[in-house]
């Protein structure tokens, strides 16, 4: 239902307009306060890069963060990552992730990023505290990438990158809750790069696609072509589950059942195993896998995806960030 409201297909969005005006007024006032320096943002001693969204829902932001961190690491840059840790609840903040940190403590995305990149990752509702925690334990870090947080103006930033779903884009264009917008589309004029996941990019936008890898067994780490798996049940607890199901079909998989889950939904063995019958194979997103690995069964697999950016702009962006980081 919410997708139909935000896309404009359902007329119910008009009933939510008063709340949207209030949201827009408050969020605009907050940004203006920082712009006029009525409120002061905390500036880190190293460059900060924000990777965020203008809309609610899944846009492919986390794969972009992983891509960015890995690309900078390949250039010899020491990167730290901070996040709010949405969906997790730690005993205290800031929380610096370790090999033992669970998604229940830190949230799905931070654990995924930590496991994929090996970069120092810290979470806190106050992102500046997360930055301080990383720099205290890893003083050699040269640049901070913040996963989400475009609207978290308490943390000053040097570069802003926005990720857009190229198919859904901005829906009906209204602020939450009548539409999907956290900020209006005009905000794009002030950011440094716009990355478009799928669809048809517009002038000045960087095209991106999510490239699926081989399926990975949660228990053994064995890899295989996902099309070799039979009697597949697909689950996806991400911001936009249909994207994952479409990716599976693009890979030649015709799932017997597709089960969309809520983003950041807590998972346990009983609930997940109940989705699969005897003889069926479970295939999930990598984000779900970080929550299920501890209790996975032999027939549970996940399909990792990597961000693939096209054109000349990604190289220019990386050169800019490398230059920024090299000065610290």
UniProtKB/Swiss-Prot annotation:
Record's keyword terms, sorted: ATP-binding, Kinase, Lipid A biosynthesis, Lipid biosynthesis, Lipid metabolism, Nucleotide-binding, Transferase
Annotated Pfam families: LpxK
Keyword Cytoplasm on entry: no
GO cellular component, one term: plasma membrane
Catalyzed chemical reaction(s): a lipid A disaccharide + ATP = a lipid IVA + ADP + H(+)
The protein's annotated pathway: Glycolipid biosynthesis; lipid IV(A) biosynthesis; lipid IV(A) from (3R)-3-hydroxytetradecanoyl-[acyl-carrier-protein] and UDP-N-acetyl-alpha-D-glucosamine: step 6/6
Family (UniProt): Belongs to the LpxK family.
Task of the protein: Transfers the gamma-phosphate of ATP to the 4'-position of a tetraacyldisaccharide 1-phosphate intermediate (termed DS-1-P) to form tetraacyldisaccharide 1,4'-bis-phosphate (lipid IVA).
EC number of this enzyme: 2.7.1.130
Molecular function in Gene Ontology: ATP binding; tetraacyldisaccharide 4'-kinase activity
Organism: Escherichia coli O1:K1 / APEC
Family matches, as HAMAP family: LpxK
Protein name per the record: Tetraacyldisaccharide 4'-kinase
One biological process term in Gene Ontology: lipopolysaccharide core region biosynthetic process
Binding locations of ATP: 55-62
